[in-house]
């Protein structure tokens, strides 16, 4: 499987501030690559460099196996993209907007606009003014515009940002269809980890401009650990009892009386009995598994995600 995007020590500085710091990413052909990070982690800056919108301070970019800086014009003809919120003429229809874009980029195929509108599910909205579109419809129209020239690579910057649950589900279905049915390689940035979790083949996690990890998602799922979660009236007492009676040391203490126990998974009944007999109220017991979001928070050292 060939490599579609490869960066080597890609760095972008603004004054003394490193927005992207020696970034090395590898995106394989046909994959959906999830580029994950908190807001301000360097995701959009990276995408702008990949699209030639800003120049890196140092480092190399190869796309389709070619040096991006030496073959920028030819490479960009093979890429579709959405960076941040796509802009359109609000007083024109979807078809009229796409017609303008088609003329600008030299697309003359007669049915190109009809085809991309059907791909994104807007074929029945051709007469409605874009100003009356929902945010989800505008995002899909943005993808339609990005598909006009039949790209091999699609780069999407936070395409689910601001969408309601239905819009997110529709966007996820569309992205999956483009990758798996039309063999388009997709590079998608996001901080909405639960959406990426259901979509991607590979994950790259960026924090403060640095790539912390790049891993196939299947491997990441195997790494995520199961645990017993207790919600208790007295965490401190419960921890002492677990250590003394069961020699349990692989656990985490969370807010709201939550303790996650990563060992002794088959002994929840005995643990429950231990707590109750020692005057601890057991409010909840569940068997759960770390999500990608849990792993992400641990990897970046805690804190909020957004």
Curated annotation (Swiss-Prot):
Residues holding ATP: 37-44
Record-level GO BP terms: response to antibiotic
Nucleotide-binding as UniProt keyword: yes
Domain ABC transporter: 5-233
Keywords carried by this UniProt record: Antibiotic resistance, ATP-binding, Nucleotide-binding, Transport
A single MF term (Gene Ontology): ATP hydrolysis activity
Keyword DNA-binding attributed: no
Function: Part of the binding-protein-dependent transport system for bacitracin that confer resistance to this antibiotic. Probably responsible for energy coupling to the transport system.
Similarity annotation: Belongs to the ABC transporter superfamily.
Record's protein name: Bacitracin transport ATP-binding protein BcrA
Organism (species): Bacillus licheniformis
Gene transcribed to yield this protein: bcrA
